[in-house]
Each structure stands twice: as structure tokens, then as C-alpha cells.
Amino acid sequence: MAGSLPFHLLPDTSQVVNGRLVVGGCDLGELAEQYGTPVFVYDERHLRSRCQQAAAAFGGEAVYAAKAFLCLAMARLVQSEGLGMDVATGGELAMALQAGFPPDRLVFHGNNKSPDELVMAIEAGVGRVVVDSFDEMDRIDHLFARRGLGPVDVLIRITPGVDAHTHEFVATGHDDTKFGFTVSTGAADQAVRRAKESPSMRARGVHAHIGSQVFRLESFRESARIVARLAIPFGLEELSLGGGLGVPYVEGESAPDIAEWAEALVGTCRAEGVTGPITAEPGRAIVASAALTLYRVGTIKEIEGVRTYLAVDGGMSDNPRPVLYGSGYEIFLPRAVSAPREREVTVVGKHCESGDRLVASGWVPGDVGVGDVIATPVTGAYGHSMGSNYQKVPRPPVVFVADGESRLVVRREEFADMFRLEVG
């Protein structure tokens, strides 16, 4: 039997009213009836609070990492709270511009930016392009020489050689990675010199990102020291220290908060003699625990002495993290939040994959049944953004809740949406 629901995993405005969970003043069961399932539900006050924390912690220099969760409404919320935003593809850039996000507050990332993406970014007037390779420098030089585009304000992405102590698929700071210029080989120094000497680029600073779901502040401090020591001799004033702050997903996990993370990064850089702007790119730390996903149970299969399967109407197409990273999640019944969670279940999706598991081992009240709405918390990051149409399953809608009101910000995908691209 599991203990009571760990409330630190829930959105900030979560309350129990007559045994039912209410977020943003909205009953989750009623939201499931109104919008259907699966559905992503975001606590808008939680989102704004984390944006405000990041802005305060980094002195207004925080940049939201759009890849964690991006839609027009989220881009506008980020803008209204005074953060910049980092985008890493032409699609993310287009979404930001469509939302009316000021281009000079955008940072354009990507390890393999195409010429068309670079043209789009430069013509839009993005604030910074984070240069990731010598091939990218060649492309920028070419666009300047042949089309007169530029010069471009750039940050040089370096690979500091830091172990982030996280899953190998989201570790990016070690030497063996596709990202950036490696410090240990001298490539980082070479890249900075080239950028400073090139007429097509204005070298503004250095960027590093060591990975995602990082809980050890010392890993961040180590990266910050390396970035600072590389930047200072070249007179580069801006330091962008990436994102990656971990968040708890299951009971028993804990993580530093945004203020503690900022203190570690900024304090380290100041101690090294950095006097210029220090930026960071929180994504998951802002959106992950702001949301939960509601599903409806369709089938219960009990194998005596083995396990009980709860099959729901979503799965790996709306949350691929368990399949990709072995990520764990909690589960609960919004209609019975305070009830003892005495029945162990494995929550699976509707896809034709044995690995389509959302929760490998979760606990629910013993009376869970077909038709019940269940919820998985901490799904605000890399669920909607990494979702797919696997097996032609339509993508779920996204709903923002605040002050007792709900609003649809991304509608449920329909079959007709998938047919629109077909030309055969």
C-alpha cells in the first residue's frame, strides 16, 4: 500500500474539496467531462509563479526553454512575465513569432541549423544565435558574403566535459556529445577566436548546457567555472549557463528550487570574476509540475499473482518519457484523492506495444473501475511537446485553469487534421 498522495508533486493551486482534487479552482473530474480524455491540464498561476521566480533569481536574465512545452498561449504567458525564450528549430521560432514574441528576446539554438532556418532567424532579428559547430560558422559566413545577412550576434556553445549524473540520452555536457565545441580538445578556444575575427559574427558570449534532470548543484557549479574561465580571457561578457534543473516526479524525490540553482550558478561566476550578464534557460523547472494528464480507464486485466493492468485511452503517443527514459510517475483518482491507495497497478496505454507503459508500478484505491478518470501529475514538460500521432492517435488538447475558469488553448486533434497533409 502506498502512502497519501505526495502533494509536492501537484500544481500549486491544488486543493481537496469533498475528497476530490481541484486545480485552479476547477474540479478535475468535471474538466474530464467537459474536454474529454486524455487532456493536459495546466495551472496558470503555477506557470506564472515559476516564471516570476526565474526572473527574480537571475535578475531579469532568465530565458524559457521552449522545447519543454510550447504553444501560442505559453509563449504569450512567458512574454508577459518578462522572460526571454530559447527556440531550437524553425518550427519553434515560427511559433514564437506567431505569438508576437519580440524577436530580440529570442535565443536560437540547434546543433544542425539549416541555411533556411538561419535565414529565418537572422531576417527576423533574433537576439542571439547560439553557434554550435564550425559548419554552422561556414553557413553564417556564406549568408553574410552572398546575401548580406548579418553580422549576427552569437554565443559560442562549448562542451565543458562535465558529468551531469543523469540519463545518457539527456546528458550533453560530457566530451562525447553531438553538441558544441569541446573544451578539452581546444575546439572551444578555436571557435571563439574565429567568431571574434569573422566579419559575419559578433561574439557576445559563451553558452553551455550539461543536460536535463540534473539534481547535483555541484555539476552546475563545475560547468559555470569552466565557462567563466574560458570567457574571461577573451573579454566575452555574456555567460549563458543553460537549463537542466531537475524536478521530482515520484514520491521520495526532491530537487533544488530555482533560487538555489541560480545562487549556485551566479555565485560561482561572480567568484570567478564575471561582471557581465549571466543567463540561464529553465524549461522543465517552470512547466513540469504545473500540469497533470487526465485519462479514462477502459480495461482492467488482472493476472492473479502477477499484476493488474489498467489500460487507459492515451499512452506513449502523449507521454513517451517512460518508454524513452524509463521515467517514473505517480497515479491517483481525482474523485478520491484522500482514499487509501491500496491496489498496485501497472498503467498501460492503447498502443500495440508491450512497452507502452505510463506507470510501471502505481497505487490506486481498491474500488478503481472501468470508466474512472485517473491522473498522472508532473506531465507539463516533454509530454505535449514530444507527443506523436503513432497509430494515427489524435493528440490531446491543452487546457489552462485559473481562478475557477478553464480555457482551451490547444484543441483536440481530429482525424481530419491528419488527412490535411495527404496528397496521394
Label the predicted regions.
Residues D27, L31, D43-H46, R50, ...:
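General structural feature for long, well-ordered alpha-helical segments within catalytic domains
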Residues H46, K67-C71, A88-G91, N111-K113, ...:
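Active-site beta-loop-alpha junctions enriched in small/polar residues
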Residues E61-V63, G82-G84, P103-V107, R128, ...:
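Structural preference for beta-strand elements that scaffold enzyme active sites
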Residues M74-A75, A96-L97, L118, I140-D141, ...:
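Short glycine-/acidic-enriched loop or helix-start segments at secondary-structure transitions
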